[in-house]
Amino acid sequence: MAWVSTQASLPEHRNIERTAGTEQTHVPVWKRRQTRHLWPVMEKREVPEPTADGLGAPEDEGQNVAIELQNPSALNPPLTDGGLVPNLKWSFALSNNLKDKGGYIREQLESDLPPSTDFAGAQNHLTKGSIRQMHWHSCSEWGYVTNGTVTISMVDNDGRNQVANATAGDIWYFPKGQPHVIQGVEDSNEYLLVFDAGDFANEGLTFNVDDWLTHTPAEVILKNFGLDNRSTAFDHVPPNFGSINTGKVADESVDSPFGQLTGNASWYFPASKMEFTQAPGGGGSYKRVDSTNFPVSQKIVGQIVRVKPRGMREMHWHPNGVEWLYFQSGTARATVWLGAGNARTFDFTDGDTAVFPDNSGHYIENTSDTDDLFYLEIFNSDVVEDVSLIQWLALTPPDLVSQVLNVSVDVVKALSKEKQVILAAKP
């Protein structure tokens, strides 16, 4: 990787324009843009150039320094990259912000990230008392609270109900077609949603209750709720409540005449109270939440992963399908290998999502020297499964591995027979 200091090296690459006998110093591309507020930052940071391993040349035009700084592996891919791999990364910072009174929603859809046909994601933000209105979906919903506390209320088709306060780190799972509502409890509340439908924005996937009532004849509504024909009870249903609107934090309890969704039937999982499992490789820890400990989660499952500085999620693949990822904090890089010489390396930071194709080989490395990496691994399955490259080689006759890879038998015999999951950085 070649990095060029802004202050030290830009003058060496400047262009001199002569007009009417005078000399004018060429202004860097990033200074000609309407980004004056970023100039102090750019002046102090190094400007990346597409030059490495004796290849490439300095950029003259079309340079977006901020994006290139976040994606060094795109500017200077490793020499091991090759073939054709589509873009597998998206950032919520690029998503259209759907603002309502009391919050906003930012989505990552198949139209944003075409390989993400199995999953869509959404960041939801609610202020105190604001309500993500009563609704249901024709797909499954998996939720993860990233900040604050939200009240989730749900009812199943047998009339069993559940009301829970989900705090940062907690998870919920709403099966397809089951109604629910979410309300912000603290001053600022945010949660991530994952849906097992890449085309989530299409019609027929979300059903808001106010929309239904305002498109139903008034006499039918009164008959449905057993009200007198002269009743005005439903005359003021808002025709455009929106996905989110302001409100007051609910404090009334509700009866459960048909039982509650508790125990193995619970749609809420307090993962914040769950201890991290230390990875055998010593490079971090993880929380696995799937149907083995959260039985209702039959279509979407996941892992919360913490990788220590310079640690690495070992080389592996997932035999049961596509992996969708959300990077909550930290910086990372990953090379996704699709077979037949096709491989591409990506860089990730806060708010990025990714999709790794079915059975593709990959690793995820924390590129920071000081900060932990936190990210989510999500799967369209009832269990989390992975195959470790190290374990596979270690549990195969060593002389076979030696012949295939042209490494010594002693090296193969020294490999750990246990999955390392997350490897520690070497001193």
Predicted region positions:
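Glycine- and acidic-residue-biased ligand/ion/polar-headgroup-sensing regions
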Residues: 128-131, 136-158, 309-341, 350
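Intrinsically disordered, low-complexity regions enriched in proline, serine, glycine
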Residues: 134-136, 154-155, 162-163, 193, ...
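A contiguous, mid-protein "functional segment" used to position or interact
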Residues: 190-235, 371-415
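Short acidic-glycine-tyrosine-enriched beta hairpin
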Residues: 126, 156-177, 324, 338-359
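A short, N-terminal "cap"/entry segment at the start of jelly-roll beta-barrel domains
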Residues: 11-14, 18, 25-122, 223-308, ...
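Ligand-binding loop in jelly-roll beta-barrel domains
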Residues: 167-168, 176-208, 322, 349-350, ...
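Short, conserved catalytic/metal-binding micro-motifs enriched in Asp/Glu and His
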Residues: 4-8, 20
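Histidine-centered metal-chelating micro-motifs
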Residues: 130-133, 151, 170-172, 176-181, ...
